[in-house]
Regions:
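Cytoplasmic helix-loop-helix junction between adjacent transmembrane helices
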Residues: 99-137
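Cytoplasmic membrane-interface "Motif A"-like loop-to-helix N-cap segments
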Residues: 57-69, 286-299
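Symmetry-related core transmembrane helices of the 12-TM Major Facilitator Superfamily/SLC fold
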Residues: 168-187, 392-411
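Extracytoplasmic gate region of multi-pass secondary transporters
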Residues: 11-16, 224-275, 335, 369-370
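C-terminal transmembrane helical hairpin of 12-TM major facilitator-type secondary transporters
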Residues: 291-338
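C-terminal ends and interior cores of transmembrane alpha-helices
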Residues: 70-89, 300-314
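Central cavity-lining transmembrane alpha-helices of secondary-active solute carriers
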Residues: 38-54, 268-281
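Glycine-rich segments within core transmembrane alpha-helices of 12-TM secondary carriers
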Residues: 128-154, 359-370
């Protein structure tokens, strides 16, 4: 997952380059970049995640996960090829878009497989901590991408052009990480098989007749108000952060008048914060509960951060750093409380499908907001370089998204208090 997160965010602190496509031999502009990043979610949105979640419940983590880890690596290889192919900009964009589609579906299903395994391994205790620790390690990949990419693609003087190989350097590093990740996945498969043998479990869910997966179980999930509330919170909360990261440098540089490296360190505070605080907040959720309250606080912190990014005085880096602190805490709090809540409200036999449905609706939002952000920046800048007006307009969009997330978090908290049988706010039973 470290490699997956790195590859997904390898251009986040280089997004400002796409605001001046004449300086790129690749020839993409901000709208093209937004379209490329949205490709991650296409197959996920149009049925891939849901179908694959069902396969996960039928075939198990090891078989299904291995297929999609291979798909993730293949998609990354296709993206890398498109960057160095020398094809016309629109053609290379199409190839990269297809590669990103396969990379995205493979990455998401691999993530579902890992999450499902953690739910199995830590069912008897410390699940929130385990999920928080897994998120922390994965987001180190994001942090690495945000910091290393500007060093791999060094800034050039006005009028100079970035070659195809220069633009593709982060992708080649990502492929190397992906190869190492596949070796680690093989080790994970062996460990999971050993765990099942010791526990007397099967990888797929096919034991008792009453525990068999049925399509009707999906319909029951869609009628589960608790599940729907968590899924919608996921889509709006993650859209306010993940979509923001994709255009981080294009927002932070003009808003706070900082150089590229400062902007990369500024936004890297997000994953670095989760590395430290996601496991700690996981322990808090395990030990004292109140999961929906932490979701509400995290959503409020994200809204505060985006209000700063949109309306704080321009040219003052302090506000940018402060906003990243708030966003980092929110990015740690909400997932630490949200993901462990899912196994509490859905049966084990459809847990893979449940996670896949949440990832599906999340990807629907990510695809839409990435494209919209790229379109806003492209329309605002018109090939004239980074623009503060475009950054502010994008941030207003993210503020609106955060407001919806906050309302959903409040509704979930209110529903939990009125219906304590949900057990979402109870501490871990261990």
């Amino acid at each position: 997952m470290f490699a997956s997160y790195y590859f997904d965010d390898m251009f986040s602190t280089l997004s400002h380059l796409f605001e001046n496509p004449s300086a790129l031999q690749l020839g993409w502009n901000s709208a093209d970049y937004g379209l490329y990043t949205s490709g991650y979610s296409v197959l996920c949105v149009f049925g891939g995640l849901v179908v694959c979640g069902m396969l996960l419940d039928k075939w198990g983590v090891r078989i299904t996960g291995s297929i999609f880890v291979a798909m993730m690596a293949g998609g990354a290889a296709l993206v890398t090829y498109s960057l160095v192919s020398g094809l016309p900009p629109k053609t290379s964009l199409s190839v990269a878009y297809i590669g990103c589609m396969f990379f995205g579906l493979g990455s998401e299903i691999a993530g579902v497989a890992v999450t499902r395994s953690i739910a199995k391994w830590f069912k008897d205790g410390n699940m929130a901590f385990a999920m928080g620790l897994q998120l922390a390690i994965a987001r180190l990949g994001t942090a690495f991408a945000l910091v290393i990419s500007p060093k791999l693609v060094a800034a050039k003087a006005v009028g100079q052009t970035y070659s195809l190989m220069e633009t593709a350097r982060p992708a080649f590093l990502g492929l190397a990480l992906m190869a190492a990740g596949m070796v680690l996945w093989a080790a994970f498969v062996a460990m999971d098989a050993k765990f099942d043998r010791r526990a007397g479990l099967k990888d797929s869910v096919d034991t008792a007749e009453e525990d068999k997966f049925r399509f009707s179980d999906v319909l029951k999930l869609l009628k589960n108000k608790r599940f729907i509330a968590i899924a919608l919170l996921c889509v709006f909360f993650y859209s306010s952060i993940i979509s923001f990261k994709k255009f981080a440098s294009a927002i932070l540089i003009p808003r706070f008048d900082v150089p590229v490296e400062a902007a990369s360190w500024m936004v890297s505070m997000l994953p670095f914060a989760t590395v430290v605080f996601a496991p700690l907040f996981g322990i808090v959720v395990d030990k004292i509960g109140h999961g929906t309250r932490w979701m509400l606080i995290g959503a409020a912190l994200a809204l505060t951060a985006h209000l700063m990014l949109a309306f704080a005085p321009s040219g003052v880096p302090f506000y940018g750093y402060l906003a990243m602190v708030f966003l980092g805490f929110g990015y740690s709090l909400v997932p630490a409380a949200m993901w462990p809540s899912v196994p509490k409200i859905v049966p084990d036999k459809v847990l893979g499908t449940a996670f896949s449905l949440i990832y599906w609706v999340q990807n629907l939002g990510l695809m839409s907001f990435k494209m919209l952000a790229g379109k806003i920046l492209a329309d605002s800048n018109l090939d004239k370089g980074v623009s503060e007006s475009g950054a502010v307009r994008v941030e207003v969009m993210f503020v609106s998204v955060c407001v919806v997330a906050l309302v959903l978090a409040y509704a979930l908290n209110l529903y939990s208090r009125r219906n304590p049988q949900m057990r979402l706010d109870l501490p871990d039973k261990s």
